[in-house]
From Swiss-Prot:
Pfam family, one: Trp_syntA
GO cellular component: cytosol
Protein name stated in the entry: Tryptophan synthase alpha chain
Functional pathway: Amino-acid biosynthesis; L-tryptophan biosynthesis; L-tryptophan from chorismate: step 5/5
Xref: SUPFAM superfamilies: Ribulose-phoshate binding barrel
Record-stated family: Belongs to the TrpA family.
EC number: 4.2.1.20
Gene giving rise to this polypeptide: trpA
Organism: Sodalis glossinidius (strain morsitans)
Enzyme superclass (EC): lyase
Active site annotation, chain numbering: E49 (proton acceptor), D60 (proton acceptor)
Length: 268
């Protein structure tokens, strides 16, 4: 958890926001997946949000669903993913690493055992996408026991009572949904809801990162001007992987260019 605090402090001192890419571990295969993660970090990613392939990713649109299928077809299992995570952490000791998960993957290992495994390989946060806040207590308790930040989603229609709960229960960062629905850059991010961000700050919530539909530098700037601490981009990145799956050199260069452009937007 402390890696997020250190990151946000360092960025604030430089008057920068965070740019956080999302990819699915093992997409399109384990070897290239690790090269992709190297490329994202080398191009300026401030933190990583990583998915473990899941057969029924309800919160995701077709782009990330296809990433899950590619990873599955290359034989990736949760055990492989944890091996990859240990490799990434050993190579990059300072960068915050978060997992975006579905509850069945946590249940399969056992809630406490899963979070213990996360701590063992150096994971900083876990967002369980299909568990609403009111059902999240066992996950949050296990996360905190193992010093893993439980990430809480803030929907765009949150009322004051929910914002208080989000501020109370979240750690690491707060995942601010730019709009309702599933992931996908084909649906643009709405204008950030500044009153949500201001209220979360008033209630001392973990810093907000805006996600869903972030695909252009202008959207990153808009999110930061509204008061977020940064932005998460997933589908736009995964689409580059999908488009250039058969030409890794082009894929990696396109990914680097995309990350450089969106990271540059965090500098004002």
């Amino acid at each position: 958890m402390e890696r997020y605090q250190q990151l946000f402090s360092q960025l604030a001192a430089r008057h920068e926001g965070a740019f956080v890419p999302f990819v699915t571990l093992g997409d399109p295969n384990p070897t290239l997946s690790l090269r992709i993660i190297d490329t994202l970090i080398d191009a300026g990613a401030d933190a990583l949000e990583l998915g473990i392939p899941f057969s029924d990713p309800l919160a995701d649109g077709p782009t990330i669903q296809n990433a899950n299928l590619r990873a599955f077809s290359s034989g990736v299992t949760p055990a492989h993913c944890f091996e990859m995570l240990a490799t990434i952490r050993q190579k990059y000791p300072a960068i915050p690493i978060g997992l975006l998960m579905y509850a069945n993957l946590v249940y399969n290992e056992g809630i406490d055992a899963f979070y213990a495994h996360c701590a063992e390989v150096g994971i900083d946060s876990v967002l369980v996408a299909d568990v609403p806040l009111q059902e999240s207590l066992p996950f949050r308790q296990a996360a905190l026991r193992h010093n893993v930040a439980p990430i809480v989603i803030c929907p765009p229609n949150s009322d004051d009572a929910l914002l208080r709960e989000i501020a109370s229960h979240g750690r690491g960062y707060t995942y601010l949904l730019a709009r309702a629905g599933v992931t996908g850059s084909e649906k643009r991010a709405n204008t950030p809801l500044k009153h949500l961000i201001d209220t979360l700050k008033e209630y001392h919530a973990a810093p907000t990162l805006q996600g869903f539909g972030i695909s252009e530098p202008g959207q990153v700037r808009t999110a930061l001007h509204a008061g977020t601490a940064g932005a998460i981009s997933g589908s736009a990145i995964v689409r580059i992987i999908e488009k250039h799956e058969d030409n890794p050199a082009v894929m990696l260069e396109q990914l680097a260019q995309f990350v450089r452009e969106l990271k540059a937007a965090t500098r004002g």
